[in-house]
Swiss-Prot record:
Gene Ontology molecular function terms on file: antiporter activity; metal ion binding
UniProt-recorded name of the protein: Sodium/hydrogen exchanger 9B2
Keywords: Antiport, Cell membrane, Cytoplasmic vesicle, Endosome, Hydrogen ion transport, Ion transport, Membrane, Metal-binding, Mitochondrion, Sodium, Sodium transport, Synapse, Transmembrane, Transmembrane helix, Transport
GO cellular component: apical plasma membrane; basolateral plasma membrane; mitochondrial membrane; recycling endosome; recycling endosome membrane; synaptic vesicle membrane
Self-association and partners: Homodimer; dimerization is essential for SLC9B2 activity. Lipids seem to play a role in the stabilization of the dimerization subdomain.
Main function: Electroneutral Na(+) Li(+)/H(+) antiporter that extrudes Na(+) or Li(+) in exchange for external protons across the membrane. Uses the proton gradient/membrane potential to extrude sodium. Contributes to the regulation of intracellular pH and sodium homeostasis. Also able to mediate Na(+)/Li(+) antiporter activity in kidney.
Note: The subcellular localization of SLC9B2 remains controversial. Was initially thought to partially localize to mitochondria. However SLC9B2 does not seem to contain a mitochondrial targeting sequence. It was later established that its localizes predominantly in plasma membrane or intracellularly to endosomes and lysosomes. In another recent study, endogenous SLC9B2 in the distal tubular cell line mpkDCT4 is detected in recycling endosomes but absent in plasma membrane.
Reaction catalyzed: Li(+)(out) + H(+)(in) = Li(+)(in) + H(+)(out); Li(+)(in) + Na(+)(out) = Li(+)(out) + Na(+)(in); Na(+)(in) + H(+)(out) = Na(+)(out) + H(+)(in)
Entry similarity comment: Belongs to the monovalent cation:proton antiporter 1 (CPA1) transporter (TC 2.A.36) family.
GO biological process terms held by the UniProt record: proton transmembrane transport; sodium ion homeostasis; sodium ion transport
Organism this protein belongs to: Xenopus tropicalis
Length: 539
């Protein structure tokens, strides 16, 4: 029939449609079981109304573009309705699953610990902060600005902790004892130190060009000295505390720099001169120097006695940290042996456990500066011994970091109380931060002079060397935690000022640094002539 939407090709001469159907559905009884014999049926040609050409069924299945516009709209509406069908599908199902998992985590912990997991308890506060910080990081990462690198999720985590602390209704319910928060931050610090130690490439270390060496050490040292002098005169810090603050500020953040550099590298900007690789490689060594300097000053600041005793104490802590790191590193080099099962898992457990033990043990034995050095040296030596196998261990450590990162930045934000901050303190901390940043940018520019870079490239490198985040969050509160352990009120005030500067540094430089890199990179760096750029490994 011409009015029919479908027409069936005849099975053969003299057979009508009913006969073809009978042949197709012919039933045969065999051993009492009825089976159906199928004959090959000619393909069905689909005809559409309004004079449209027939649609091939393969194209109909594989492409929505072949459908008439009205059919596409109906399909989209059906897909949206299906998301709320029973049982739920898609995003609706994902939301229900995630909420259920969060509630179950709390319910399981509550069933074991009781009141500690109710509002006002430590475990309730930790879980609330963890989920809030993770949600804040997710929301920040959803902000997409075309042609710009994404905002670092750590910014949302930091702000989530800050809001929890400074909204009275929430603050009364989310309470975390300072000993619990200090312990969690120290665990996060141990994980960061392990990642930094494993991330050091001995081959790159041997082949470091002069410009990479200068960029790793020059800005960090000069900024630390600048912050020490400025804080000594305008904030009243002792020089040891000033240098401690300086080394907190002196580290650049791989969490901001590396993703931004990878985006530029993928698009071919600065690749011919190796600028993304230079910044990613120098970042690790810059962080190691800052952490080492901080731990040395930490030991000197909390030692009692004369200046000579303080210096000797600082040197002793460095020696003890390096010696313990060498011992643990050689142990991990040979144990577990390569013939054991689950080798990667055992290595990951041992290096994490030893690093946490080193950080907490150094505090217990009165050598607070030794734990960080021990962990760095141990992880570096273990990475050399494991060679290419260390990549799997790094992946496992990264999972631990994914858990503790929201806790770390959330706890740092939760330490800052607007009510307890004095305007003059914020002003002095901001002034110290700005002066140190200006000096760092200038020194970074000088460090890459006479290295074959153009003026625009030098300016870009100096600006890209500005962001602060991960290291500041990890070590910014260590001095405050140590002072609280010793119950020294004067040192607690110094420690809170150090933490405030670290908080402001993250809040200001992390988003601005990411935006500056994304905006200035395409304008100041030369684009590679080759359209295909091979991504080089990140640090």
């Amino acid at each position: 029939m011409e009015d029919s939407l479908f027409s069936v090709d005849k099975a053969g001469p003299g057979k009508d449609a009913s006969a073809a159907s009978a042949d197709c559905n012919h039933m045969v009884a065999e051993d009492g079981i009825i089976t159906e014999q199928h004959k090959e049926i000619p393909l069905v040609a689909l005809k559409v109304p309004d004079g449209h050409a027939p649609i091939d069924e393969c194209e109909l299945l594989n492409s929505d573009d072949q459908l008439p516009k009205g059919s596409q709209n109906q399909t989209n509406i059906c897909m949206r309705i299906r998301a709320f069908a029973c049982p739920p599908q898609g995003c609706f199902s994902l939301a229900i699953t995630n909420v259920t998992m969060v509630i179950l985590i709390w319910a399981v912990v509550w069933s074991i610990t009781g009141p500690e997991c109710l509002p006002g308890g430590n475990l309730f506060g930790i879980l609330a902060l963890l989920f809030s910080a993770a949600l804040g990081g997710k929301l920040i990462s959803l902000i997409k600005i075309p042609s710009l690198p994404p905002l670092p999720p750590l910014l949302g985590m930091l702000l989530a902790g800050f809001l929890i602390r400074n909204i009275p209704v929430i603050t009364d319910q989310v309470q975390i004892h300072h000993k619990w928060s200090a312990a969690l931050r120290n665990i996060a610090l141990a994980i960061i130190l392990v990642r930094a130690g494993l991330g050091l490439d001995p081959k790159a270390l041997r082949k470091l060009k002069a410009v990479c060496l200068r960029l790793s050490f020059g800005p960090c040292v000069v900024e630390s000295c600048t912050a020490a002098v400025v804080s000594h005169f305008i904030m009243g810090f002792p020089l040891t505390w000033g240098f401690m603050l300086g080394f907190v500020l002196g580290a650049v953040s791989p969490a901001v720099v590396v993703p931004s550099m990878l985006i530029l590298q993928k698009e071919g900007f600065g690749v011919d001169k190796g600028i993304p690789t230079l910044l990613m490689a120098a970042g690790s060594f810059d962080d190691v120097l800052a952490i080492t300097g901080f731990n040395t000053c930490l030991g000197m600041a909390f030692s009692s006695g004369s200046t000579l005793n303080t210096i000797v104490r600082g040197v002793l802590e460095v020696v003890v940290g390096i010696a313990a790191g060498l011992l643990f590193g050689f142990f991990l080099h040979y144990f577990p042996s390569k013939d054991q099962e689950n080798l990667k898992g055992k290595r990951s457990y041992l290096i994490l456990a030893l690093s946490v033990f080193a950080v907490f043990g150094s505090l217990y034995f009165g050598f607070p500066g030794s734990g960080g050095l021990c962990t760095l040296v141990m992880a570096f030596l273990a990475g050399i011994g494991w060679s290419t196998d260390k990549t799997v261990v790094e992946d496992i450590i990264a999972v631990s970091w994914d858990i503790f990162q929201p806790l770390l930045f959330g706890l740092i934000g939760a330490e800052i109380s607007v009510a307890s901050l004095k305007p003059e303190t914020v002003g002095l901390c901001t002034a110290t931060l700005i002066i140190a940043l200006i000096i760092r940018i200038c020194i970074s520019f000088l460090m890459v002079c006479f290295s074959g870079f153009s003026l625009k490239e030098k300016i870009f490198i100096s600006l890209a060397w500005m962001p602060k985040a991960t290291v500041q969050a990890a070590i910014g509160s260590v001095a405050l935690d140590t002072a609280r352990t010793l119950e020294n009120k004067q040192f607690e005030d110094y420690g809170m000022d150090v933490l405030t500067v670290a908080f402001l540094g993250i809040l200001v430089t992390a988003p601005i640094g990411a935006l500056v890199i994304g905006l200035t990179g395409p304008k100041m760096l030369e684009k590679s002539e080759s359209r295909t750029v091979t991504e080089e490994g990140s640090v």
